[in-house]
Amino acid sequence: DVEGRLLEDYWDADWDKVELHFAQMKRLGANVVRIHLQVGKFLVAPDQPNEKSLERLSKLITLAERTGLYLDVTGLGCYHKQDVPAWYDNLSESERWAAQAFFWRAIARQCANSPAIFCYDLMNEPVVPVGKGKTGAWLGPAFAGKHFVQYISLDQQDRPREEIAKKWIHQLTAAIREVDQRHLITVGLVDWSLDRPGLRSGFVPSVVCDELDFVCVHLYPEKGKLDDAITTLKGFAIGKPLVIEETFPLKCSPQEFDQFLDRSREHATGWI
């Protein structure tokens, strides 16, 4: 909301605001709403869900159905570091992946029968490390007080980064498919995921996206660099539907942003 709170921070005490925002989005012509679910709000232990949060999610799904909006359900959030349980950060890689699979199984079970689910986004901006990271340091640097980037491993060992990403995607998609065989699955990729010189996430779309139903990229065009943004976007067009899941005139003028959106239509099939 305008105070920077996540949905889970106020949907218990201020449900009227949630209903108001959904009605406003519908009037504005939106058809998909992206929601972010934090691990700390939905798991009380690696294998125990927060039933109260699941009930509130069901209420939100009913609201979406009634309003005529679809949900992009983005999970495994750790945006507020203070809300991340210590037990979660202390898990080994395999234990953490198992907890993440349990999370998604619980969420998908809640969503499976609803016509209001657009997709499951496995995680916002996951990254595979190069080499070995610091114990417990699963989050990337904060931006505006929130941690948007997460590591799915803390130790590359001798493994190709893309293979780690593929195995992680496989484990989580398999967990969802145990309880929901029909809704779409994707993952929100940073724009520096392409196989090219410089910073890379390890999630090369042409290598890791086989089990995803469509590709999502987060792309913020920069002033005077629209050609670069379109070239980057084109790199994510790998033969699957391509959605720009995040974009905004953060680094360019509104006029340039309009140009970017118009030009992106050649490659993208949706914008959130």
Language-model region placement:
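Active-site mouth of glycoside hydrolases
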Residues: 1-214, 224, 247, 251-252, ...
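Histidine/acidic-residue-rich catalytic or RNA/ligand-binding cores of hydrolases
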Residues: 198, 226-230, 253-265
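Mature extracellular/periplasmic domains of secretome proteins
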Residues: 203-208, 231-236, 260-266
